[in-house]
From Swiss-Prot:
One of its GO terms (cellular component) is plasma membrane. The gene is fluC. This is Fluoride-specific ion channel FluC. Belongs to the fluoride channel Fluc/FEX (TC 1.A.43) family. Na(+) binds at G76, T79. Fluoride-specific ion channel. Important for reducing fluoride concentration in the cell, thus reducing its toxicity. One of its GO terms (biological process) is cellular detoxification of fluoride. InterPro entries: FluC (IPR003691). GO terms for molecular function: fluoride channel activity; metal ion binding. It is found in: Cell inner membrane. It catalyses: fluoride(in) = fluoride(out). The chain crosses the membrane at residues 6-26, 36-56, 69-89, 99-119. Keywords: Cell inner membrane, Cell membrane, Ion channel, Ion transport, Membrane, Metal-binding, Sodium, Transmembrane, Transmembrane helix, Transport. It holds the Pfam family CRCB.
Length: 126
């Protein structure tokens, strides 16, 4: 990746993170048990990555920096859930149902387990 790719990822990531933060500021306090801002960021990111993958797959002639800006940068900054979602859907479209299921299990189960482990580690060391 050249210098323009690094800039594209950085600018996109900053914009996505700012939007995610804005959602959190606006909506997370409404229901702390289910933070609506985080949910909105994840659901919007999942939807937008589907649109983006479809767009970039049909516009292969665009410079790769546009994809880096939109998907890796912006949607990665908005939520990593969008990347995860696109990977699972790609497996499903390819008919790789076992891989899609394993992807779900490892990402969701692993994230929950490691979050609990991180909390346990903090409490142990605090």
């Amino acid at each position: 990746m050249g210098p323009l790719g690094f800039v594209a990822v950085g600018v996109g990531a900053a914009a996505g993170a700012w939007l995610r933060w804005g959602f959190a500021v606006l909506w997370n306090a409404i229901n702390p048990a289910l933070p609506y801002g985080t949910l909105a960021a994840n659901l919007l990111g999942g939807y937008l990555v589907g649109l983006a993958v479809g767009f970039f797959d049909t516009h292969a002639g665009l410079p790769p920096e546009w994809r880096l800006l939109a998907i890796t940068g912006f949607l990665g900054g908005l939520t990593t859930f969008s990347t995860f979602s696109s990977e699972v859907v790609a497996n499903l479209i390819a008919g790789d149902y076992g891989w899609a299921g394993l992807h779900l299990l490892l990402h969701l189960g692993g994230s929950l387990l490691l979050t609990a482990f991180g909390l346990w580690t903090y409490r142990l060391l605090a």
